[in-house]
Swiss-Prot record:
Organism: Mycoplasma pneumoniae (strain ATCC 29342 / M129 / Subtype 1)
Superkingdom, natural source: Bacteria
Entries under InterPro entries matching the protein: YbaB-like_sf, YbaB/EbfC
Name of the protein this chain belongs to: Uncharacterized protein MG134 homolog
One example GO MF annotation: DNA binding
């Protein structure tokens, strides 16, 4: 395979992966935490669109537990979206025999 052909294939792969990344950033993901006690809607670019909390969790006497649950739920959602992004980028890069 010629160097020119390899270079063009790499450029095409880069364009495709950039487009996939842009599409992913605009995609919405919905996560439920603790049997939907906390629901998070998050974009692929990790911007939170909304957080919904089951009213049964709201105890004015125990604010700390709710804060901890929200923090844990957000961290899980962010981690899941990052993992999906990493998987998408891994799949987007073509396997070119003889290069690596």
């Amino acid at each position: 395979m010629s160097f020119k052909k390899i270079t063009e294939m790499m450029r095409q792969a880069e364009r495709q992966s950039k487009q996939k990344a842009l599409d992913f950033e605009q995609k919405l993901f919905e996560y439920s935490y603790k049997n939907a006690a906390i629901k998070i809607i998050i974009f692929g670019n990790l911007t939170i669109k909304s957080i919904t909390i089951d009213p049964a969790l709201i105890d004015p006497e125990d604010k700390v537990t709710l804060e901890e649950m929200i923090t844990e739920a957000v961290n899980e959602a962010v981690g899941d979206v990052k993992a999906k992004y990493d998987q998408l980028m891994e799949e987007a890069m073509p396997q070119m025999p003889g290069l690596f």
